[in-house]
Amino acid sequence: LSIKPGDAKVTVDTSKNGLAQDENGNWYYYKNGVIDTSYTGIAPNAYGWWRVVNGAVDFNCNSVEANEYGWFCIRGGKVDFDYTGIAQNAYGWWRIVNGAVDFNCNSVEANEYGWFYLRGGKVDFNYNGLAANAYGWWKITGGAVDFNYTGMAQNEYGLWHVVNGMVDFSR
């Protein structure tokens, strides 16, 4: 048995574009019916927005990644539009509101690791001083609220008494 050119024909469905499942149940990003291995980004389909790496959906991605609409928190490969908190990627820790990075956040916010000072939406691990949020003013050391600090701390408004990391205005 020998096969010569032209004996077998492969049909490509060129209408397949964007995210779709192949016959084995794997999800890929298609362009003109072919898996686009050059594509890395976030792509939408009917089930959500997904992290794609080299043309394949990366269901193991837990990060903050970007597409043309902004930066988003990804859990299990999917943008988590319900998440509000602080999430990490290779560039730092970011304030997330409804799944998207809030680059306007200048506050003290919390995640499962503690309370952190954010400037421009990013945790500033170099910040040392006092900073406020909706719950009060806090002593920040290395970008995190120092709940072990009791003593005096100064900022541009004066010298303040701090108890367990929080400014005590009653003294």
Q: Predicted regions span which residues?
A:
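Extracellular adhesion/carbohydrate-binding repeat motifs centered on closely spaced tryptophans
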Residues: 1-171
